[in-house]
């Protein structure tokens, strides 16, 4: 007999960008939809797609590239919505480390990565820039990329601008150094992708659960949309409510990460067709997807109008970079008005 319970697995320990999920819980938005949501945290973030794909968990969060790879590896998952759209992702390093904007300056360096796909990405980039995998030392860091850079265990590592880069900036501030000494070689530019969409954070479902419980998923997403609208309308008030529930995030670092995540929150929750096409192509280029792979996403369970995609995604990325730098300097909550 079907119940109203859903198990939901985060992609990491609670972070600033998980705020819509927890507020949907604490503000009763799930309950309004007749749902009982069990929010779970992974022991190992790399296990998320396997746990959802195997049916041990109903739904969860994962980045686009991992969602694609999971289905290709036999774990039946589908993206039903977006949480964080195109956060800038790249190779992070500190000024003075001997690394420059020239990718070949990474030769002989220790480079950290989160999971196996990070290693595949770095290997593909080294090949593109005339290097070999043996020209650098790969270090698997999990979610500790910034920590390892600070401790000197690695020279550089893959991270995202609104999370690990902010962590490096906070470290620099405590050292009396400018935050701008935290640098990033953006992977979208290095790999000529035209977007940072491979790290878009998605709401994903086990396929069998989705097939049997379409209305549950629709109701879940309605609650998430209401919580997202609440966050975007009053981010300061929303944050106060979030840290009341998650006091471990009541610190300057988490608040600054939240400010930097704010512009990336998907207001519509829609999967962006162009982004999926690009990342599916990128996955085939990395040989983690077969040539005939069909993207595993749907917008069928979103019950509000789909927005038009931006006409010039490269210009949108350029404007977002300027916007995020301004946010770093001023510490404000502002959304970017992208060109139509």
From Swiss-Prot:
Instruction: Provide a GO biological process annotation.
Output: thiamine diphosphate biosynthetic process
The residues that hold pyridoxal 5'-phosphate are: 115-118
User: Required cofactors, per record?
Assistant: Fe cation
| Gene Ontology molecular-function annotations | 4-amino-5-hydroxymethyl-2-methylpyrimidine phosphate synthase activity from histidine and PLP; metal ion binding
Q: Motif CCCFC: which residue numbers?
A: 195-199
Signal peptide, first to last residue: none
Q: List the catalytic activities from the record.
A: N(6)-(pyridoxal phosphate)-L-lysyl-[4-amino-5-hydroxymethyl-2-methylpyrimidine phosphate synthase] + L-histidyl-[4-amino-5-hydroxymethyl-2-methylpyrimidine phosphate synthase] + 2 Fe(3+) + 4 H2O = L-lysyl-[4-amino-5-hydroxymethyl-2-methylpyrimidine phosphate synthase] + (2S)-2-amino-5-hydroxy-4-oxopentanoyl-[4-amino-5-hydroxymethyl-2-methylpyrimidine phosphate synthase] + 4-amino-2-methyl-5-(phosphooxymethyl)pyrimidine + 3-oxopropanoate + 2 Fe(2+) + 2 H(+)
Q: Does the keyword Nucleotide-binding apply?
A: no
Pathway noted in the entry: Cofactor biosynthesis; thiamine diphosphate biosynthesis
Tell me the active site: 66
The cross-references to CDD domains, in alphabetical order and at most eight, read:
PBP2_THI5
Instruction: Specify the enzyme's EC class, one word.
Output: transferase
Assigned keywords, A-Z: Iron, Metal-binding, Pyridoxal phosphate, Thiamine biosynthesis, Transferase
**The keyword rRNA processing belongs to this UniProt entry's keyword annotation:** no
This entry's Enzyme Commission designation comes to 2.-.-.-
Q: Point out residues bearing the modification N6-(pyridoxal phosphate)lysine.
A: 62
Q: Which InterPro entries match?
A: NMT1/THI5, SsuA/THI5
| Subunit structure and binding partners | Homodimer.
PANTHER family given for it? 4-AMINO-5-HYDROXYMETHYL-2-METHYLPYRIMIDINE PHOSPHATE SYNTHASE THI11-RELATED
According to its UniProt entry, the function of this protein is described as:
Responsible for the formation of the pyrimidine heterocycle in the thiamine biosynthesis pathway. Catalyzes the formation of hydroxymethylpyrimidine phosphate (HMP-P) from histidine and pyridoxal phosphate (PLP). The protein uses PLP and the active site histidine to form HMP-P, generating an inactive enzyme. The enzyme can only undergo a single turnover, which suggests it is a suicide enzyme.
Instruction: Name the family.
Output: Belongs to the NMT1/THI5 family.
Q: What is this protein called?
A: 4-amino-5-hydroxymethyl-2-methylpyrimidine phosphate synthase THI13
Organism, by scientific name, is Saccharomyces cerevisiae (strain ATCC 204508 / S288c) (Baker's yeast)
């Amino acid at each position: 007999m079907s119940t109203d319970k859903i198990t939901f697995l985060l992609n990491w320990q609670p972070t600033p960008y998980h705020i819509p999920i927890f507020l949907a819980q604490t503000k009763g938005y799930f309950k309004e939809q007749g749902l009982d949501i069990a929010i779970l945290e992974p022991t190992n973030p790399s296990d998320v797609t396997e746990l959802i794909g195997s049916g041990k968990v109903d739904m969860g969060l994962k980045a686009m590239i991992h969602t694609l790879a999971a289905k290709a590896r036999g774990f039946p998952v589908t993206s039903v919505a977006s949480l964080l759209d195109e956060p800038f992702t790249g190779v992070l390093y500190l000024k003075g480390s001997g690394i420059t904007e020239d990718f070949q300056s990474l030769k002989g360096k220790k480079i950290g990565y989160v999971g196996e796909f990070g290693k595949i990405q770095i290997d593909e980039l080294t090949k593109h820039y005339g290097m070999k995998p043996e020209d650098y030392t790969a270090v698997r860091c999990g979610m500790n990329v910034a920590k390892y850079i600070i401790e000197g265990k690695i020279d550089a590592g893959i991270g995202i601008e609104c999370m690990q880069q902010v962590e490096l900036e906070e470290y620099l501030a405590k050292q009396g150094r400018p935050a701008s000494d935290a640098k990033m070689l953006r992977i979208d530019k290095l790999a000529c992708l035209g977007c940072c969409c491979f790290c878009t954070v998605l709401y994903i479902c086990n396929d069998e659960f989705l097939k049997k419980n379409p209305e549950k998923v629709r109701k879940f997403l309605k609650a998430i949309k209401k919580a997202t609208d609440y966050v975007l309308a009053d981010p300061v008030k929303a944050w106060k409510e979030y840290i009341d529930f998650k006091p471990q995030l009541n610190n300057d670092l988490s608040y600054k990460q939240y400010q930097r995540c704010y512009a990336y929150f998907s207001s519509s929750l829609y999967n962006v067709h162009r982004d999926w096409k690009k990342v599916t192509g990128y996955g085939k280029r990395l040989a983690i997807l077969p040539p005939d792979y069909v993207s595993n996403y749907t917008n069928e369970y979103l019950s509000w109008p789909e927005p038009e995609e931006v006409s010039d995604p490269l210009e949108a990325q350029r404007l977002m970079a300027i916007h995020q730098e301004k946010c770093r300097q001023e510490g404000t909550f502002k959304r970017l008005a992208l060109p139509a």
